[in-house]
Protein backbone atom coordinates (compact mmCIF):
# COMPACT_ATOMS: atom_id res chain seq x y z
CA UNK A 1 0.00 0.00 0.00
CA UNK A 2 2.79 2.41 0.95
CA UNK A 3 4.75 1.60 -2.20
CA UNK A 4 1.70 2.36 -4.30
CA UNK A 5 1.24 5.80 -2.63
CA UNK A 6 4.90 6.74 -3.10
CA UNK A 7 4.81 5.73 -6.76
CA UNK A 8 1.66 7.77 -7.38
CA UNK A 9 3.06 10.96 -5.70
CA UNK A 10 6.49 10.86 -7.38
CA UNK A 11 5.55 13.12 -10.37
CA UNK A 12 4.06 15.75 -8.06
CA UNK A 13 7.19 15.84 -5.86
CA UNK A 14 9.35 16.16 -8.97
CA UNK A 15 7.38 19.24 -10.12
CA UNK A 16 7.66 20.87 -6.67
CA UNK A 17 11.43 20.39 -6.40
CA UNK A 18 12.18 21.50 -9.97
CA UNK A 19 12.24 25.35 -9.22
CA UNK A 20 14.48 24.77 -6.22
CA UNK A 21 17.02 22.89 -8.33
CA UNK A 22 17.15 25.73 -10.85
CA UNK A 23 18.15 28.28 -8.15
CA UNK A 24 21.83 27.36 -8.24
CA UNK A 25 23.02 31.00 -8.05
CA UNK A 26 23.47 32.80 -4.65
CA UNK A 27 20.57 34.71 -3.15
CA UNK A 28 20.30 38.42 -4.05
CA UNK A 29 18.01 40.92 -2.36
CA UNK A 30 17.44 43.90 -4.67
CA UNK A 31 14.37 45.19 -2.84
CA UNK A 32 16.19 47.34 -0.23
CA UNK A 33 15.89 51.09 -0.63
CA UNK A 34 17.43 54.12 1.07
CA UNK A 35 15.08 56.11 3.26
CA UNK A 36 13.94 59.40 1.78
CA UNK A 37 15.73 62.45 3.26
CA UNK A 38 13.81 64.43 5.84
CA UNK A 39 14.72 67.73 4.17
CA UNK A 40 16.77 68.96 1.24
CA UNK A 41 19.79 70.05 3.28
CA UNK A 42 23.42 69.00 3.30
CA UNK A 43 23.13 66.96 6.51
CA UNK A 44 20.02 65.03 5.47
CA UNK A 45 21.16 64.23 1.90
CA UNK A 46 24.88 63.60 2.47
CA UNK A 47 24.22 61.05 5.23
CA UNK A 48 21.80 58.10 5.15
CA UNK A 49 21.02 55.00 7.18
CA UNK A 50 22.09 51.66 5.77
CA UNK A 51 18.92 49.78 4.70
CA UNK A 52 20.40 46.51 6.01
CA UNK A 53 21.98 47.41 9.38
CA UNK A 54 20.56 50.95 10.04
CA UNK A 55 24.05 52.40 10.40
CA UNK A 56 24.45 56.09 9.45
CA UNK A 57 27.04 56.26 6.65
CA UNK A 58 28.29 59.07 4.42
CA UNK A 59 26.92 58.71 0.89
CA UNK A 60 30.40 58.68 -0.66
CA UNK A 61 31.12 55.55 1.40
CA UNK A 62 27.68 53.94 1.24
CA UNK A 63 28.41 51.80 -1.83
CA UNK A 64 31.63 50.46 -0.31
CA UNK A 65 29.81 49.66 2.91
CA UNK A 66 26.98 47.81 1.13
CA UNK A 67 29.13 45.61 -1.10
CA UNK A 68 31.65 44.77 1.64
CA UNK A 69 29.52 44.43 4.77
CA UNK A 70 26.37 43.07 3.05
CA UNK A 71 27.51 40.86 0.19
CA UNK A 72 24.12 39.22 -0.09
CA UNK A 73 22.75 42.40 -1.72
CA UNK A 74 22.76 42.99 -5.45
CA UNK A 75 25.72 45.22 -6.34
CA UNK A 76 24.00 46.68 -9.39
CA UNK A 77 20.98 47.70 -7.34
CA UNK A 78 23.18 49.18 -4.60
CA UNK A 79 25.19 51.18 -7.13
CA UNK A 80 21.95 52.51 -8.64
CA UNK A 81 20.64 53.64 -5.22
CA UNK A 82 23.87 55.46 -4.36
CA UNK A 83 24.07 57.11 -7.79
CA UNK A 84 20.52 58.44 -7.49
CA UNK A 85 21.20 59.91 -4.04
CA UNK A 86 24.43 61.57 -5.18
CA UNK A 87 22.62 63.00 -8.21
CA UNK A 88 19.92 64.37 -5.89
CA UNK A 89 22.60 66.08 -3.77
CA UNK A 90 24.21 67.69 -6.82
CA UNK A 91 20.82 68.82 -8.15
CA UNK A 92 19.71 70.37 -4.83
CA UNK A 93 22.97 71.78 -3.42
CA UNK A 94 24.55 72.70 -6.76
CA UNK A 95 27.94 70.98 -6.47
CA UNK A 96 28.98 67.31 -6.26
CA UNK A 97 29.42 65.78 -2.83
CA UNK A 98 33.05 65.70 -1.72
CA UNK A 99 34.57 62.36 -0.86
CA UNK A 100 36.98 63.98 1.59
CA UNK A 101 34.15 64.25 4.11
CA UNK A 102 34.51 61.88 7.07
CA UNK A 103 31.88 59.35 8.06
CA UNK A 104 29.64 59.83 11.07
CA UNK A 105 32.05 57.92 13.33
CA UNK A 106 34.92 60.25 12.40
CA UNK A 107 37.25 57.28 11.71
CA UNK A 108 36.85 56.66 8.01
CA UNK A 109 40.13 54.76 7.78
CA UNK A 110 39.23 52.14 10.37
CA UNK A 111 35.69 51.71 9.04
CA UNK A 112 36.98 50.22 5.76
CA UNK A 113 39.70 47.79 6.72
CA UNK A 114 40.74 45.26 4.04
CA UNK A 115 38.68 42.18 3.31
CA UNK A 116 40.55 38.94 4.01
CA UNK A 117 39.93 36.40 1.24
CA UNK A 118 41.28 32.86 0.92
CA UNK A 119 43.62 34.16 -1.77
CA UNK A 120 44.81 37.30 0.03
CA UNK A 121 43.77 40.85 0.97
CA UNK A 122 41.40 43.11 -0.99
CA UNK A 123 41.82 46.87 -0.41
CA UNK A 124 38.54 48.65 0.38
CA UNK A 125 40.08 52.13 0.19
CA UNK A 126 40.57 51.88 -3.59
CA UNK A 127 37.79 52.92 -5.94
CA UNK A 128 38.26 49.74 -7.99
CA UNK A 129 38.61 46.62 -5.87
CA UNK A 130 39.99 44.26 -8.50
CA UNK A 131 43.49 43.60 -7.13
CA UNK A 132 44.09 41.00 -4.44
CA UNK A 133 47.37 41.02 -2.51
CA UNK A 134 48.63 37.57 -1.58
CA UNK A 135 50.37 38.49 1.69
CA UNK A 136 49.90 40.99 4.47
CA UNK A 137 53.23 42.68 3.72
CA UNK A 138 52.28 43.28 0.09
CA UNK A 139 49.02 44.87 1.18
CA UNK A 140 50.80 47.19 3.64
CA UNK A 141 53.28 48.16 0.91
CA UNK A 142 50.32 49.00 -1.36
CA UNK A 143 48.85 51.25 1.36
CA UNK A 144 52.17 53.04 1.86
CA UNK A 145 52.66 53.62 -1.90
CA UNK A 146 49.12 54.48 -3.05
CA UNK A 147 47.23 55.79 -0.02
CA UNK A 148 49.76 58.28 1.28
CA UNK A 149 47.11 60.19 3.26
CA UNK A 150 46.56 57.19 5.56
CA UNK A 151 48.81 56.80 8.58
CA UNK A 152 50.39 53.36 8.18
CA UNK A 153 51.33 53.12 11.85
CA UNK A 154 47.69 53.62 12.83
CA UNK A 155 46.35 51.09 10.31
CA UNK A 156 48.90 48.28 10.68
CA UNK A 157 47.75 47.02 14.13
CA UNK A 158 44.16 46.70 12.85
CA UNK A 159 44.96 44.71 9.69
CA UNK A 160 44.06 41.09 10.54
CA UNK A 161 46.41 38.18 9.96
CA UNK A 162 45.60 35.61 7.24
CA UNK A 163 43.44 32.69 8.44
CA UNK A 164 45.24 29.53 9.45
CA UNK A 165 45.25 26.56 7.12
CA UNK A 166 45.04 28.65 3.95
CA UNK A 167 47.94 27.69 1.72
CA UNK A 168 48.34 29.19 -1.70
CA UNK A 169 49.84 26.56 -3.97
CA UNK A 170 51.81 27.61 -7.00
CA UNK A 171 51.70 25.18 -9.89
CA UNK A 172 54.13 25.29 -12.75
CA UNK A 173 51.82 23.40 -15.10
CA UNK A 174 50.83 24.63 -18.51
CA UNK A 175 47.14 24.65 -17.83
CA UNK A 176 45.49 27.34 -15.75
CA UNK A 177 42.73 26.88 -13.22
CA UNK A 178 39.90 24.83 -14.70
CA UNK A 179 36.40 24.29 -13.32
CA UNK A 180 35.85 20.91 -11.73
CA UNK A 181 32.40 20.48 -13.26
CA UNK A 182 30.63 21.87 -16.30
CA UNK A 183 27.11 21.60 -17.55
CA UNK A 184 26.26 20.32 -20.97
CA UNK A 185 26.05 23.04 -23.61
CA UNK A 186 27.82 25.73 -21.52
CA UNK A 187 30.77 27.50 -23.15
CA UNK A 188 33.35 29.34 -21.00
CA UNK A 189 33.66 33.02 -21.97
CA UNK A 190 36.58 35.20 -20.93
CA UNK A 191 35.61 38.01 -18.57
CA UNK A 192 35.95 41.50 -19.99
CA UNK A 193 36.40 44.58 -17.81
CA UNK A 194 35.90 47.99 -19.35
CA UNK A 195 37.66 50.94 -17.70
CA UNK A 196 35.35 53.46 -16.06
CA UNK A 197 35.84 57.02 -17.28
CA UNK A 198 35.22 59.06 -14.17
CA UNK A 199 33.95 62.59 -14.68
CA UNK A 200 36.35 65.10 -13.06
CA UNK A 201 34.82 66.68 -10.01
CA UNK A 202 34.41 70.41 -9.72
CA UNK A 203 35.81 71.54 -6.40
CA UNK A 204 33.95 74.40 -4.79
CA UNK A 205 31.96 75.44 -1.77
CA UNK A 206 29.88 72.54 -0.53
CA UNK A 207 27.23 74.71 1.10
CA UNK A 208 26.42 77.79 -1.01
CA UNK A 209 24.41 80.37 0.88
CA UNK A 210 21.74 82.69 -0.31
CA UNK A 211 23.98 85.75 0.03
CA UNK A 212 26.49 84.23 -2.43
CA UNK A 213 24.18 84.67 -5.38
CA UNK A 214 25.73 85.82 -8.68
CA UNK A 215 24.71 89.30 -9.81
CA UNK A 216 24.88 91.15 -13.07
CA UNK A 217 27.83 93.33 -13.90
CA UNK A 218 25.65 96.45 -13.94
CA UNK A 219 24.02 95.80 -10.56
CA UNK A 220 23.92 98.57 -7.99
CA UNK A 221 25.09 97.74 -4.46
CA UNK A 222 23.86 99.36 -1.28
CA UNK A 223 26.04 100.62 1.54
CA UNK A 224 25.49 97.46 3.59
CA UNK A 225 26.63 95.03 0.85
CA UNK A 226 30.20 94.03 0.05
CA UNK A 227 30.60 92.82 -3.56
CA UNK A 228 33.43 90.73 -4.93
CA UNK A 229 35.28 92.67 -7.61
CA UNK A 230 36.05 89.46 -9.54
CA UNK A 231 32.77 87.56 -9.85
CA UNK A 232 30.20 90.22 -8.81
CA UNK A 233 28.94 88.22 -5.85
CA UNK A 234 27.69 90.17 -2.87
CA UNK A 235 28.23 89.47 0.82
CA UNK A 236 26.74 90.86 4.01
CA UNK A 237 30.06 91.36 5.83
CA UNK A 238 33.71 91.97 5.09
CA UNK A 239 34.75 88.71 6.74
CA UNK A 240 32.62 86.71 4.29
CA UNK A 241 34.11 88.68 1.40
CA UNK A 242 37.69 88.02 2.56
CA UNK A 243 36.99 84.31 3.02
CA UNK A 244 35.54 84.22 -0.50
CA UNK A 245 38.63 85.93 -1.95
CA UNK A 246 40.98 83.54 -0.16
CA UNK A 247 39.10 80.40 -1.21
CA UNK A 248 37.79 81.18 -4.72
CA UNK A 249 40.45 83.63 -5.97
CA UNK A 250 43.65 82.83 -4.06
CA UNK A 251 46.27 83.15 -6.81
CA UNK A 252 44.47 84.21 -9.97
CA UNK A 253 43.79 80.67 -11.24
CA UNK A 254 40.18 80.51 -10.05
CA UNK A 255 37.20 81.39 -12.20
CA UNK A 256 36.67 85.07 -12.85
CA UNK A 257 35.68 87.58 -15.53
CA UNK A 258 37.99 88.23 -18.43
CA UNK A 259 40.55 90.97 -18.03
CA UNK A 260 41.25 90.47 -14.32
CA UNK A 261 44.84 91.16 -13.37
CA UNK A 262 46.35 88.11 -11.66
CA UNK A 263 49.00 90.33 -10.05
CA UNK A 264 46.26 92.25 -8.24
CA UNK A 265 44.86 89.03 -6.80
CA UNK A 266 48.32 88.02 -5.63
CA UNK A 267 48.82 91.44 -4.01
CA UNK A 268 45.52 91.15 -2.13
CA UNK A 269 46.40 87.66 -0.90
CA UNK A 270 49.85 88.82 0.21
CA UNK A 271 48.43 91.86 2.04
CA UNK A 272 45.80 89.71 3.79
CA UNK A 273 48.45 87.21 4.91
CA UNK A 274 50.66 90.02 6.18
CA UNK A 275 47.76 91.55 8.09
CA UNK A 276 46.92 88.18 9.66
CA UNK A 277 50.48 87.69 10.91
CA UNK A 278 51.23 91.24 12.08
CA UNK A 279 47.97 92.97 12.94
CA UNK A 280 45.02 90.73 12.16
CA UNK A 281 42.85 92.11 14.96
CA UNK A 282 43.07 95.75 13.78
CA UNK A 283 39.64 97.33 13.28
CA UNK A 284 39.22 100.71 11.61
CA UNK A 285 36.36 102.79 10.23
CA UNK A 286 37.58 104.30 6.98
CA UNK A 287 35.81 105.71 3.91
CA UNK A 288 37.59 105.64 0.55
CA UNK A 289 37.97 109.25 -0.63
CA UNK A 290 39.13 108.14 -4.09
CA UNK A 291 35.55 107.26 -5.04
CA UNK A 292 33.39 110.15 -6.22
CA UNK A 293 30.20 109.10 -4.48
CA UNK A 294 30.83 106.39 -1.92
CA UNK A 295 29.66 106.18 1.67
CA UNK A 296 30.76 102.64 2.42
CA UNK A 297 32.74 102.23 5.64
CA UNK A 298 35.56 99.69 5.66
CA UNK A 299 36.39 98.12 9.00
CA UNK A 300 39.37 96.01 7.91
CA UNK A 301 42.52 97.28 6.16
CA UNK A 302 42.63 94.24 3.87
CA UNK A 303 39.13 94.97 2.56
CA UNK A 304 40.10 98.59 1.86
CA UNK A 305 43.30 97.41 0.12
CA UNK A 306 41.30 95.02 -2.07
CA UNK A 307 38.85 97.80 -3.03
CA UNK A 308 41.60 100.25 -4.02
CA UNK A 309 43.63 97.59 -5.84
CA UNK A 310 40.72 96.55 -8.09
CA UNK A 311 38.68 99.77 -8.38
CA UNK A 312 41.64 102.16 -8.62
CA UNK A 313 44.42 100.10 -10.26
CA UNK A 314 46.55 103.16 -11.08
CA UNK A 315 46.86 104.15 -7.40
CA UNK A 316 49.27 102.83 -4.79
CA UNK A 317 46.92 100.76 -2.62
CA UNK A 318 49.30 100.30 0.32
CA UNK A 319 50.07 104.04 0.49
CA UNK A 320 46.42 105.06 0.38
CA UNK A 321 45.43 102.49 3.01
CA UNK A 322 48.02 103.89 5.42
CA UNK A 323 47.03 107.47 4.56
CA UNK A 324 43.30 106.94 5.01
CA UNK A 325 43.76 105.16 8.33
CA UNK A 326 46.02 107.96 9.59
CA UNK A 327 43.75 110.79 8.43
CA UNK A 328 40.44 109.28 9.56
CA UNK A 329 41.70 107.86 12.84
CA UNK A 330 40.11 110.63 14.90
CA UNK A 331 36.93 110.92 12.83
CA UNK A 332 33.90 109.73 14.75
CA UNK A 333 32.05 106.79 13.23
CA UNK A 334 28.44 105.71 13.52
CA UNK A 335 28.19 102.07 14.56
CA UNK A 336 24.95 100.13 14.96
CA UNK A 337 24.65 98.86 18.54
CA UNK A 338 22.81 95.72 17.39
CA UNK A 339 24.80 94.31 14.45
CA UNK A 340 28.01 96.41 14.82
CA UNK A 341 27.87 97.73 11.24
CA UNK A 342 29.51 101.10 10.62
CA UNK A 343 28.02 103.96 8.62
CA UNK A 344 29.35 107.25 7.32
CA UNK A 345 26.60 109.48 8.71
CA UNK A 346 24.01 109.55 11.44
CA UNK A 347 21.21 109.63 8.85
CA UNK A 348 22.44 106.39 7.30
CA UNK A 349 22.62 104.78 10.74
CA UNK A 350 19.09 105.93 11.60
CA UNK A 351 17.74 104.58 8.31
CA UNK A 352 19.46 101.25 8.86
CA UNK A 353 18.22 101.01 12.44
CA UNK A 354 14.63 101.84 11.51
CA UNK A 355 14.56 99.33 8.65
CA UNK A 356 16.52 96.45 10.19
CA UNK A 357 16.03 96.76 13.95
CA UNK A 358 12.73 98.55 14.36
CA UNK A 359 11.47 95.99 16.88
CA UNK A 360 14.56 96.38 19.05
CA UNK A 361 14.46 100.15 19.01
CA UNK A 362 13.18 100.55 22.53
CA UNK A 363 15.57 97.97 23.96
CA UNK A 364 18.63 99.51 22.28
CA UNK A 365 17.82 103.17 22.93
CA UNK A 366 20.67 104.20 25.20
CA UNK A 367 19.59 107.78 25.85
CA UNK A 368 16.08 106.80 26.92
CA UNK A 369 14.47 107.19 30.31
CA UNK A 370 16.46 105.81 33.23
CA UNK A 371 14.58 103.77 35.81
CA UNK A 372 15.58 101.97 38.99
CA UNK A 373 15.68 98.68 37.11
CA UNK A 374 18.30 99.72 34.53
CA UNK A 375 20.35 102.52 36.07
CA UNK A 376 23.51 100.36 36.38
CA UNK A 377 24.72 100.18 32.77
CA UNK A 378 27.01 97.82 30.84
CA UNK A 379 28.65 99.77 28.01
CA UNK A 380 29.78 96.70 26.03
CA UNK A 381 26.37 95.09 25.47
CA UNK A 382 24.15 98.15 26.19
CA UNK A 383 22.22 96.45 28.98
CA UNK A 384 20.98 97.82 32.29
CA UNK A 385 20.89 96.25 35.76
CA UNK A 386 19.08 97.12 38.95
CA UNK A 387 22.06 96.83 41.31
CA UNK A 388 25.80 97.34 41.23
CA UNK A 389 26.42 93.78 42.39
CA UNK A 390 24.41 92.41 39.47
CA UNK A 391 26.38 94.53 37.00
CA UNK A 392 29.66 93.41 38.60
CA UNK A 393 28.70 89.73 38.23
CA UNK A 394 27.67 90.32 34.61
CA UNK A 395 31.03 91.93 33.82
CA UNK A 396 32.88 88.98 35.37
CA UNK A 397 30.86 86.29 33.56
CA UNK A 398 30.40 87.90 30.14
CA UNK A 399 33.31 90.29 29.67
CA UNK A 400 36.11 88.68 31.69
CA UNK A 401 36.42 91.26 34.47
CA UNK A 402 39.22 90.16 36.79
CA UNK A 403 38.15 89.25 40.31
CA UNK A 404 39.90 90.91 43.26
CA UNK A 405 39.55 90.18 46.97
CA UNK A 406 38.97 93.03 49.46
CA UNK A 407 39.85 92.55 53.16
CA UNK A 408 38.04 94.44 55.88
CA UNK A 409 40.38 96.99 57.53
CA UNK A 410 38.79 96.40 60.94
CA UNK A 411 38.26 92.63 61.32
CA UNK A 412 40.52 91.40 58.46
CA UNK A 413 37.67 89.41 56.91
CA UNK A 414 38.14 88.90 53.15
CA UNK A 415 35.32 89.51 50.66
CA UNK A 416 35.04 88.49 47.00
CA UNK A 417 33.94 91.92 45.74
CA UNK A 418 33.85 95.50 46.91
CA UNK A 419 30.07 95.55 47.23
CA UNK A 420 30.05 92.74 49.78
CA UNK A 421 32.68 94.69 51.73
CA UNK A 422 30.52 97.82 51.57
CA UNK A 423 27.52 95.90 52.91
CA UNK A 424 29.67 94.44 55.69
CA UNK A 425 30.94 97.88 56.73
CA UNK A 426 27.43 99.33 56.80
CA UNK A 427 26.29 96.55 59.16
CA UNK A 428 29.31 95.82 61.37
CA UNK A 429 31.58 98.89 61.22
CA UNK A 430 29.34 101.90 60.70
CA UNK A 431 32.10 104.41 61.43
CA UNK A 432 34.21 103.26 58.47
CA UNK A 433 33.41 104.21 54.88
CA UNK A 434 34.92 103.00 51.62
CA UNK A 435 36.01 106.52 50.75
CA UNK A 436 38.15 106.55 53.92
CA UNK A 437 40.26 103.67 52.61
CA UNK A 438 40.43 104.97 49.02
CA UNK A 439 38.01 102.55 47.30
CA UNK A 440 35.60 103.56 44.51
CA UNK A 441 32.34 101.66 43.97
CA UNK A 442 30.83 103.50 41.01
CA UNK A 443 30.75 106.66 38.91
CA UNK A 444 27.73 108.51 37.56
CA UNK A 445 27.11 110.01 34.14
CA UNK A 446 25.94 113.59 34.58
CA UNK A 447 24.11 113.58 31.23
CA UNK A 448 21.92 110.47 31.30
CA UNK A 449 22.05 109.66 35.06
CA UNK A 450 23.52 106.18 34.55
CA UNK A 451 26.02 104.46 36.84
CA UNK A 452 29.22 102.66 35.78
CA UNK A 453 31.82 100.62 37.63
CA UNK A 454 34.88 102.63 36.56
CA UNK A 455 35.91 105.90 34.98
CA UNK A 456 37.07 104.02 31.87
CA UNK A 457 33.56 102.64 31.21
CA UNK A 458 32.06 106.08 31.76
CA UNK A 459 34.59 107.62 29.37
CA UNK A 460 33.77 105.15 26.57
CA UNK A 461 30.05 105.71 27.15
CA UNK A 462 30.44 109.50 26.96
CA UNK A 463 32.56 109.31 23.80
CA UNK A 464 30.03 107.08 22.06
CA UNK A 465 26.75 108.67 23.10
CA UNK A 466 27.47 112.19 24.42
CA UNK A 467 30.10 113.39 21.90
CA UNK A 468 32.93 113.61 24.42
CA UNK A 469 36.40 114.21 23.05
CA UNK A 470 38.16 110.80 23.00
CA UNK A 471 41.47 112.55 23.76
CA UNK A 472 40.12 113.92 27.02
CA UNK A 473 41.22 112.14 30.22
CA UNK A 474 38.96 109.39 31.48
CA UNK A 475 39.02 110.71 35.05
CA UNK A 476 38.67 114.49 35.55
CA UNK A 477 41.26 116.28 37.62
CA UNK A 478 40.27 117.90 40.94
CA UNK A 479 39.57 121.66 40.90
CA UNK A 480 42.40 123.74 42.37
CA UNK A 481 39.95 126.01 44.21
CA UNK A 482 37.80 125.03 47.14
CA UNK A 483 35.12 126.63 49.27
CA UNK A 484 37.70 128.02 51.70
CA UNK A 485 39.52 129.92 48.94
CA UNK A 486 36.26 131.39 47.66
CA UNK A 487 35.23 132.49 51.14
CA UNK A 488 38.63 134.10 51.81
CA UNK A 489 38.55 136.03 48.53
CA UNK A 490 35.11 137.50 49.24
CA UNK A 491 35.75 138.38 52.90
CA UNK A 492 37.20 141.84 52.15
CA UNK A 493 34.07 143.13 50.39
CA UNK A 494 31.42 141.48 52.58
CA UNK A 495 31.02 142.21 56.33
CA UNK A 496 31.56 139.39 58.77
CA UNK A 497 27.95 139.21 59.89
CA UNK A 498 26.58 139.13 56.34
CA UNK A 499 29.23 136.56 55.37
CA UNK A 500 28.28 134.35 58.28
CA UNK A 501 24.63 134.42 57.26
CA UNK A 502 25.40 133.92 53.56
CA UNK A 503 27.79 130.99 53.92
CA UNK A 504 27.34 129.37 57.33
CA UNK A 505 29.19 126.21 56.20
CA UNK A 506 32.43 128.02 55.27
CA UNK A 507 35.37 128.15 57.68
CA UNK A 508 35.84 131.38 59.63
CA UNK A 509 39.41 132.61 60.12
CA UNK A 510 38.77 135.10 62.90
CA UNK A 511 42.30 135.25 64.26
CA UNK A 512 43.84 135.84 60.88
CA UNK A 513 41.33 138.57 60.07
CA UNK A 514 42.07 140.44 63.33
CA UNK A 515 45.79 140.31 62.73
CA UNK A 516 45.47 141.84 59.30
CA UNK A 517 43.30 144.71 60.62
CA UNK A 518 45.80 145.50 63.42
CA UNK A 519 48.70 145.59 61.00
CA UNK A 520 46.77 147.94 58.70
CA UNK A 521 46.07 150.36 61.61
CA UNK A 522 49.74 150.46 62.61
CA UNK A 523 50.87 151.17 59.09
CA UNK A 524 48.30 153.90 58.71
Curated annotation (Swiss-Prot):
Disulfide bonds: none annotated. Residues 479-500 have a biased composition (Low complexity). It is found in: Mitochondrion. A zinc finger (C2H2-type) spans 48-70, 121-147, 226-249, 286-312, 334-357, 376-399, 406-429, 443-465. GO terms for molecular function: DNA-binding transcription factor activity, RNA polymerase II-specific; sequence-specific DNA binding; zinc ion binding. Keywords: Metal-binding, Mitochondrion, mRNA processing, Repeat, Transit peptide, Zinc, Zinc-finger. Pfam families: zf-C2H2_6 (PF13912), zf-C2H2_jaz (PF12171), zf-met (PF12874). Disruption phenotype: RNAi-mediated knockdown at the procyclic stage causes a reduction in mitochondrial mRNA editing. Formation of the REH2C complex is not affected but REH2C complex association with the GRBC, REMC, RECC complexes and with and pre-mRNA is impaired. Integrity of the GRBC complex is not affected but GRBC complex association with the RECC complex and pre-mRNA is reduced. Causes a slight decrease in REH2 protein levels. Does not affect the RNA unwinding activity of the REH2C complex. The keyword Disulfide bond does not apply. Its main location: mitochondrion. Residues 463-524 are annotated as: Disordered. GO terms for biological process: mitochondrial RNA processing; mRNA processing; post-transcriptional regulation of gene expression; regulation of transcription by RNA polymerase II; RNA processing. InterPro entries: Zinc_finger/UBP_domain, Znf_C2H2_jaz, Znf_C2H2_type. Plays an important role in mitochondrial mRNA editing by promoting the assembly of the mRNA editosome. Facilitates the recruitment of mRNA to the REH2C complex and promotes the interaction between various editing complexes including REH2C, GRBC, REMC and RECC complexes. This is REH2-associated factor 1. It comes from Trypanosoma brucei brucei (strain 927/4 GUTat10.1). The gene is H2F1.
